[in-house]
């Protein structure tokens, strides 16, 4: 079953799903802006198109992840994103 989600006044939209190959995941698009997300469990984020400037928990420097690149976020934490252009992503819940 698909589940639609909308965050930050519609600037981030995702569709959640579960599949045998991916497990529980969501795919979505972020408009330009700055966002802070909280995690309940570890997440693996893959940038599909565009780029994300990311500040991960415990880090002091931002890092840019371009299309095809992956980063991991620990559970029970927050991470910060800066988005300069519409960017799509796949988030796997680990």
UniProtKB/Swiss-Prot annotation:
Family membership: Belongs to the nucleoside phosphorylase PpnP family.
Q: What is its EC number?
A: 2.4.2.1, 2.4.2.2
Chain's gene name? ppnP
Cellular-component GO terms for this entry: cytosol
**InterPro entries tied to this protein:** Ppnp, RmlC-like_jellyroll, RmlC_Cupin_sf
Using the UniProt record, name the top-level EC class of this enzyme in a single word.
transferase
Q: Which GO terms describe its molecular function?
A: guanosine phosphorylase activity; purine-nucleoside phosphorylase activity; thymidine phosphorylase activity; uridine phosphorylase activity
Q: Does the keyword Glycosyltransferase apply?
A: yes
Protein name according to UniProt: Pyrimidine/purine nucleoside phosphorylase
What this chain does, per the entry, is described as: Catalyzes the phosphorolysis of diverse nucleosides, yielding D-ribose 1-phosphate and the respective free bases. Can use uridine, adenosine, guanosine, cytidine, thymidine, inosine and xanthosine as substrates. Also catalyzes the reverse reactions.
- SUPFAM superfamilies, from UniProt? RmlC-like cupins (SSF51182)
Q: Which UniProt keywords apply?
A: Glycosyltransferase, Transferase
Entry's Pfam families?
A: Ppnp
What chemistry does it catalyse, as a reaction equation?
A: a purine D-ribonucleoside + phosphate = a purine nucleobase + alpha-D-ribose 1-phosphate; adenosine + phosphate = alpha-D-ribose 1-phosphate + adenine; cytidine + phosphate = cytosine + alpha-D-ribose 1-phosphate; guanosine + phosphate = alpha-D-ribose 1-phosphate + guanine
